[in-house]
Design a protein with these regions (language model features):
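Transmembrane helix recognition focused on a "late"/terminal membrane span
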Residues: 1-17, 40-133
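Long, hydrophobic N-terminal alpha-helical segment
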Residues: 5-35
């Protein structure tokens, strides 16, 4: 494999990974797997929105719940905006709604991480197949 082809493949895999992080399912859409992309988008967005619905925007807490926030950030960089809005303390959440909301939003982020890894792996396999042909 020539260096130029290898560099192009790395850049393509990076683009797939970043797009999959910015928009859940976006990496699969770039790989022309429309059905997978739609399923991933609907699943992750609904899981995240259920967590926000149960616990309000206050479950995204970059100050008091950093481990949960890291998992939530795997959904999309848009979570950083929500974290900024909720860091003022204007959206207090306590007890079960807080816990359930954090769990749902964090699980959505971790699920998106699996989908990002899968999209990058599929891009890698596609690059290997094109260089062998």
């Amino acid at each position: 494999m020539t260096r130029r082809v290898k560099d192009n493949q790395v850049m393509f895999m990076l683009a797939v990974g970043l797009l999959a992080w910015f928009v859940p399912g976006g990496g699969h859409l770039l790989l022309k797997k429309k059905k997978h992309a739609i399923i991933i988008l609907v699943t992750i967005v609904l899981t995240f929105l259920i967590g926000i619905y149960v616990g309000s925007i206050g479950v995204i807490n970059p100050v008091g719940a950093k481990p949960w926030y890291v998992a939530q950030m795997l959904n999309s960089p848009a979570v950083a905006i929500l974290g900024y809005l909720s860091s003022t303390g204007a959206y207090p959440v306590y007890a079960r709604p807080n816990e359930i909301g954090q769990i749902y939003t964090s699980v959505a982020g971790l699920l998106n991480l699996l989908c990002i890894v899968n999209a990058v792996y599929l891009a890698h396999l596609g690059g290997i197949q094109t260089t062998r042909n």
